[in-house]
Amino acid sequence: MYNTEKFDKDTFVPQCFESDGEFELRGQKIKYHTVSEDNVFYDDNGKAIASIFSYSYFRTDVENSENRPVMFCYNGGPGSSSMYVHAGFFGVKRLKYEEEIDRPTSLPPYQTIDNPDSLLDICDLVMIDPVGTGYGVLIDQSRGKDFYGIEEDAESILTFIEKWTHKYNRWLSPKYLCGESYGCTRTAVVAGMAGGGSGNNRGYGVKFDGLVMIGNTVTTGKYFFHPIPVEEAVVWFPTYAAINWFHNHPTDQSVDEFAMEAKKFADEEYLVALYKGESLQGEAREAIKKKISYYTGVSDKFLEDRALRIDDAGFRHEVIKHLGKSVSRYDGRHTRDQLVPYQDEERKGDWFDATGNRYDGFFYGALNGVILPSLNVKMDRQYLTFNLFDDETEDYGHPKWNINAKGGTTADRLRQAMVSTHGMRTFFANGWYDDCTDIGLVYYVCDHAGLPKDRVYIKPYKSGHMIYISEDNCKELSEDIRKFIEGKDPTK
């Protein structure tokens, strides 16, 4: 990767921008102050080596701010900036969504609105660009090894949070983490470190009251894309059913009813059928195939070619093949024309996906054109929406991004956090149509990771990977997180 800017550890100047504003929320005027700033890491000689960039929203028209809840928010990747959760959901100003499926487009003009679903009335908010993403920078290029990796990334975030807590005197505030996609992995490891009282470099005193996981990546496997010890076609089955429900309309049931019925079938019948393998013959085999096809929309030939075992890429290419289209991995409601065999489609990866980067221009344009100027951010530095780092460290299979290199799994770290921090709660929010971080994995992890069930909540949404896309989903997710912060069950 090449750079358009050069940073010198001897001359790096941290940036800080402040603003004040007011907007109407839930029938009241909310006054707020923002601080957008570099949070610098130094070497033993006092030279700047890296910076996490943060955007803090503080409500100012309250008597006591020192014990107000605060939520720290970030996206995933690894390598993503906070652009999506900032511009798409949490910001005081956010994108305006028009049609649930077809908009936002990737073409201007882009519309933003004062966020009617903001949580700022009850909770201060901090958006985080990790090192090397957004306005966060790796100043000393030789120090990437200290920040790029599951453990290293998490410890830098935890260090930042503790420093922020001290700087703004928020030790008495209830604290929440909200991560999307790989951000859920980050959340589990950060919370695990905090719960255990130490990271790899030092001890920590900050604790978290709750965790919000949007598009879960916490797993019992070595890392997110590593196989788990069960038939994965069974785990992903509810997502297949939901996508089939959306496109092929096999029933008058709601998507929630149909997908949960499909999950029950997968748990009780499909799993047994896959275990039996070739010994399942005759009428019993035909009956199972008929049910699988009913729930997922795939053909008899497709199933026989795969010994009844549905694979992700094959399903996305098959479910509306009769229309000459494939569905998206990130949001199965999105489609595109089938141009190549699905094996070639998979090799092209996200760049060939039906959703792919269709939203990036919309988010990036609105963030840079409206949202950051409203925060008085005036930066010559380029905003890096996504950093691929390099081929070695970006690979999930590389030891740097492999939790087993340190021992345990991300599910183990989440259990460590919840068991060691009495009262900590976790809320999993996943889209039915998300075939990247399928909701079935949430149910599986919660049944196998030894989590305290009375403090874990799961809710599916009628959306894809970024579940807040659409005005209705923004409102629903906001109301649910609001209930979670208030100590209520967010699923009710």
Task: Show the residue positions of the predicted features.
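N-terminal cap/lid subdomain of alpha/beta-hydrolase-fold enzymes
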Residues: 2-4, 46-146
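A catalytic-pocket lid/entrance helix-loop region that shapes and gates access to the active site
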Residues: 94-96, 191, 195-296
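Alpha/beta-hydrolase active-site loop
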Residues: 120-123, 130, 147-166
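Alpha/beta-hydrolase fold nucleophile elbow
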Residues: 170-182
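Glycine-rich nucleophile elbow surrounding the catalytic serine of serine-hydrolase chemistry
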Residues: 179-192
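Alpha/beta-hydrolase fold catalytic core
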Residues: 281-436
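Short alpha-helix in the alpha/beta-hydrolase fold that links the catalytic acid
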Residues: 424, 438-448
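Catalytic histidine-centered segment of alpha/beta-hydrolase-like enzymes
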Residues: 464-473
